[in-house]
């Protein structure tokens, strides 16, 4: 652990000059006295473990200029409550390391247990396992230009009670929201053309859902069962939440054979 001093005075706030374009690996690692740092809009890369162990941070804003963030860049920032990011993972729209855990240097959400809010300001996709296992998150905001939500992207985000899915999203991956027990009402926009298997499995407190179609795909060529998006299990063939009462369908050209079979708890279908 380290601290920064100026004339024997502990520095708790730091403004990085606007001329800086790169923050190197371990640049501020272990500076436990820092409570606030302002990163200029010119910065394009943040290195591995750049801010690791900065336990004084509560809120962080990473500017949109940043295009890459190193592994474990914020590892050990255990008091962090909110972070604003230009994308999720290592690189904007990168094919690998697209999870929040990558920048926190941990797996399956075992990072900052105090983290409550994540605001994503850029990128066109939310990758597979992006927020998976972050049970303490209560607020996640994704940008309007996102077109895909990956496999298990929000799996087990039990603290989430609401998520606004922008009407630019076209695909939602398998198990994308499975285990999100905080959801009571969900609205899937008309822009979505495919929904993966068990995308909403384990959303046990869901009371209403609005969908652009019934089943897996808008064109009706794949599975057309309403239960498909809730998954199946060996002990319960139709894994639909017991409290689900209202289903609103806003699009699609047909309702498939036996689409709502064994959906006894639903009282309203529009």
Language-model-detected regions and their locations in the chain:
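Solvent-exposed loop and capping/linker segments of extracellular ligand-binding repeat ectodomains
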Residues: 1-270
